[in-house]
Amino acid sequence: MIRVGYMGIPFSNSAEMSERLAKAIGLEECEHVALMSAVGVVSALMDGSIDYGVLAVCNRFAGPVMETREALEGKPIESIRMEWTHIHHCVFLKHKDAKVTKLVSHIQALLQSKDNLHRLYPNAEFSECEDTAYAAEMLADGTLSDDCAAVCRRDAGEHYRLYLAHENVEDNKENMTQFSIIRRV
């Protein structure tokens, strides 16, 4: 079976785009493999453990995804198809009454929502993690303390049964990210 790796974990934007881009190039029957990072995707392509990879390339407002750019540098990889998708972020808490001192997410989500997050949580610090959905998972399983909030997709927070504090916190309602499906040349 054809394997398509993506950065992130289930309930991330990359997971959705992995399915969408695979279908767009005619891969109806394939296994989608969560690989957390762009480096993980590129390494798996290079060692042959996946056939295709899906990476976030650029955000309309936050700019290039540097993690992807650095992972691809000098590698014999080609892009097969690129697509833009709207990106929305929510703030989820462990409990309704949580006092937020730290906002945790992928750097791109924090950058795409920084003005609204500063307005909503003026004293909270930003803390980067590998993936938006991973922030929700870590908050739910207790890896993150109750004073943390996860900035992630709505379905990620709901999957982990977190409390939805704010929806659509991205600074620009036309927030979009370009994703690419790639393969080794």
Where are these regions (language model features)?
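Domain-level signature for soluble enzymes in the chorismate/prephenate branch of the shikimate pathway
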Residues: M1-V185
